Amino acid sequence: MKTKFLLLASLGLSTFLVSCKKEETVAQAQVVKEITVSLAAANENPQPAGRTESGSATIKVFSDNSITVDATLVGLSAADNLTLAHFHAGDPVTNGPVVLDLKPTFTGGTVKATLAAVRTSFIDSIKAGTAEIYLNIHSTQVGSGIVRGQLFNPVMFAASVALSGANEVPAVTTTATGTALLRITADNKLYSKVTVTNLEANDALTMSHIHTGAAGTNGAVLIGLCSSAADFGVTKINTPTPAVINSIKADGLYVNVHSTMKASGIVRGQIR
């Protein structure tokens, strides 16, 4: 009888211990969203001079509101070092504010970050997959960012075009200079931002276009970028035809900015 009692007690204790062990087991967080981001120096606004680094990042969002980021850069200069990485708010031609500091660790060209308890509003925007958010990785030599990439609707073509009066045909004498940022995204949208500074006080910007033509020649308008002075310095979005998209990606083209005093063009720059 005593032996039987001891056996039952032993079984009861084992059951109790197993039950406790099950209760102590914490469910592992599950991946609820995974994103692959293409990174490139060409996506920076503007592209850092002489830099061609590229890479990719894998972003995972978990059910417990944690996020991991694993990124690798290719071609990072041996004289440069990665320093910071953030998520920023902004479309492909905008440099926007930091919305989340990744606080990563760096090993050469690799970036690793794990963030716990990320705010729900940010997690929800990532899950929705429509927000204008980009990953920006900074370095010692390029503090503003050495590579970047949109989390959604990736950039498939990028050009940062320097504009000057010397590029006009014939050349124009002006204090004005500028930059045209051009980005074509995966949904075949053309994002552009044309900025001109130091324009003479007696002049005013009027319009800007992409024209066909190699350096030293004048050509026809391919597509408009700015139709009034108010369009300069702000993001413009066009939906070009497939033929225009292909031309922007491959042909000899230039950006031309027109003004009241220089109707044929005050500053210009070649896309290629």
Question: Predicted regions span which residues?
Answer:
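Metal-centered catalytic cores of metalloenzymes
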Residues: 21-85, 89-208, 212-272
